């Protein structure tokens, strides 16, 4: 193992319109899947958070994708992918259109359970037995949340989870035996709502969750250093729609550092009309960053809309 650790996060667009379709595409060697494998194998992260990756009950798609990576020379024997909120039906009419069981009635948008979930792959051991999955954390339970203005009916407010996909704290075991806590998430886009700005409020609070967690303001104690926040905040610090105060607080928090990885489009990690920085890796301030970059893929459009972000840290 090298003396540095490479962390990466990427929304590779490995999501399909129905259950089982991603597994089928992986097995067939779909061009988008092949492009994703090639990019990851070229970057060679030690730990990779994949967002926008379809979850299934038996983890078959993730196992098949890991096998494809292994065939390309990059083995990830350690993986973590609990059921996400994406596509998890609430049983209620969450969007208030008079119908239930639709994609917007799930705890996180999804046509089926697990659509566009997330997965953690690691060359180093993960202490999954000590992992904290905050996916069931209620939006209304977050101190200082913006739920009050979201226009939710009382019965919806009582069950609405904060995470559109998930919030995880997963310890990775470093060669020294120390734990590095990986704080992973993939937020809802601050779009596709009405004047109540429900998704904008929720997106803001998904970032604010980490501030409250580090503050010790949640029922669970904060993680000890070293740690790193990584994932898809789905919000640019300056451009596009969204409520930026919580993200700005994370980027300027003295407990964290922002290496500002850059590539051919600067710090942008996505292109939706304009280049936007949506994906982040924020190591704790005690870690020494030795490198960082944004890597854009070649290949089919869906694979090329989002870039992989990596950060190298010295092993503590």
How should each PLM-predicted stretch be described?
Residues 93-175:
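A well-ordered secondary-structure block
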Residues 125-135, 162, 171-174, 200-208, ...:
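Metal-dependent phosphoester-hydrolase catalytic domains
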Residues 12-16, 53-57, 84-89, 126-127, ...:
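Solvent-exposed loop/turn segments at secondary-structure junctions
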């Amino acid at each position: 193992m090298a003396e540095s650790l490479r962390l990466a996060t990427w929304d590779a667009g490995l999501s399909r319109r129905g259950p089982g379709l991603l597994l089928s595409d992986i097995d067939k060697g779909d061009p988008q899947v092949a492009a994703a494998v090639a990019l990851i194998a070229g970057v060679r992260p030690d730990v990779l958070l994949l967002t926008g990756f379809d979850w299934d009950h038996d983890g078959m798609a993730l196992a098949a994708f890991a096998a494809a990576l292994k065939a390309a020379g990059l083995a990830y024997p350690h993986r973590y992918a609990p059921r996400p909120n994406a596509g998890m039906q609430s049983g209620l009419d969450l969007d208030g259109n008079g119908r239930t069981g639709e994609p917007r009635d799930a705890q996180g948008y999804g046509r089926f359970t697990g659509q566009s979930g997330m997965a953690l792959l690691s060359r180093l051991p993960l202490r999954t037995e000590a992992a904290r999955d905050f996916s069931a954390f209620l939006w209304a339970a977050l101190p200082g949340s913006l739920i009050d203005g979201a226009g939710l009916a009382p019965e919806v407010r009582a069950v609405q989870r904060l995470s559109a996909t998930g919030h995880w704290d997963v310890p990775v075991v470093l060669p020294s035996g120390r734990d590095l806590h990986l704080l992973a998430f993939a937020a809802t886009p601050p779009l596709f709502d009405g004047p109540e700005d429900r998704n904008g409020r929720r997106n803001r609070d998904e970032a604010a969750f980490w501030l409250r967690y580090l503050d010790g303001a949640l029922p669970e104690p904060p993680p000890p250093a070293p740690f790193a926040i990584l994932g898809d905040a789905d919000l640019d610090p300056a451009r596009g729609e969204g409520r930026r105060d919580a993200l700005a607080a994370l980027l300027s928090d003295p407990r964290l550092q922002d290496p500002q990885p850059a590539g051919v489009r600067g710090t942008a990690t996505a292109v939706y009309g304009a280049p936007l920085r949506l994906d982040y890796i924020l190591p704790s301030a005690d870690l020494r960053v030795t490198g960082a970059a944004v890597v854009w893929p070649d290949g089919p459009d869906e694979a090329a809309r989002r870039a992989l972000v990596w950060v190298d840290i010295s092993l503590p």
